[in-house]
Amino acid sequence: YAFVIIGFNHDTLASATAYGSATATGKAGISLQMKDCLNTTYQMNSSNTNSGGWGNCALRTTLQNTIKGQLPSAWQSIIKTVTKKASAGSTSSTISSYSDTLFLLAEVEIFGSTTYSAVGEGDQYAWYKAGNSKVKKVNGSANFWWERSPFATGSSYFCIVYSAGNASSSYANGSFGVAFGFCV
C-alpha cells in the first residue's frame, strides 16, 4: 500500500512528550494517509447506528486492535497517538475527543467544510486544501470510503466520500473502503 503525506504539524499529540520531550507546537510532525483504500471493505458497525460516534464504532476498534498490528513493526514503533475529534453521534452536536493511533479522516479534514457532519471535528489537511484528488480505489476501482464523522441529522449514517470524490453519507452497516491515517 502507498501512503501520502497529508500535513505537517497538523494533529495534536495525545502526549506532549510523545517524542521524548515536549514539542514547541504540541503537534505530530507528519500526518499520512493511505493513497487508496485497503483491499478489503469494512462496515463502521454491524447495525445501522452511529450512537456513540467514532468512539463507539466497530471499525475504530478494528483499526486500533487488528489493522495496526498488521503494519511493519518499525512503523508501529514510531506511530504517535493523536487526539481526533468527532461528534457523539445520534444527532448530537457535542464534540468528543479520542486518542487514536490509526484513524479515519473527518469530513471537514477532507473537504474544508461540513455538509453532512457536525461542526468542530478538525481542520482541513494541507493535501486536500491543495486540491489533490479525493477519489480512492478498492482493488483498482473507485469506491466509497469511510469518514469518522457521524451523520449530523440522523442516527443511522456515517459520512463517506463518494466514489466520484464528493461528500456523502451512508448506512453504518454498509461495506466501504478504508483509507486510514496516522502520524509520526
What are these regions (language model features)?
Residues 1-184:
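Collagenous Gly-X-Y triple-helix signature in extracellular proteins
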